[in-house]
Amino acid sequence: MRIVTVISLMLAVPDAATASGWYRRALGATELWNLGSVIGLEVQGAPFFLAQPESNRWESPVVLGTTTVRVEVFVDDPDTFLSGAAAAGAEYHDPIRDHEMPWGTHRQGGFFDPYGHLWLVGDKSPLRRPA
């Protein structure tokens, strides 16, 4: 069995349980496991994690007043994905629109979640390898 390398992220949130509920409603995330202050989630097979940053020398974007990472999600239907986040209270960063790229048209837009994290949502075209 080949194990694929996965790069994931852990998002700082003030309350992991509350944040988990939001991501499940907004993004259709499912919970992998729950340790209380640290929770594993996945969206369409892509894992990510939530943690309360208590005494860990890191902080949430809301506390810092800025974000240093943008979360990029590549899905089959970015319009529906972004609409679900907006319906759950996400703040639009950029509506889904077509971007002309060297490989063709790429549909992408974005939102800020309630915890200050910037999410860009696009189709899977950047993941395709040229023939």
Model-derived features: where do they sit?
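Short, surface-exposed ligand-recognition loops at beta-strand->loop->(often short) alpha-helix junctions
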Residues: 11-15
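Vicinal oxygen chelate
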Residues: 1-10, 20-112, 122-131
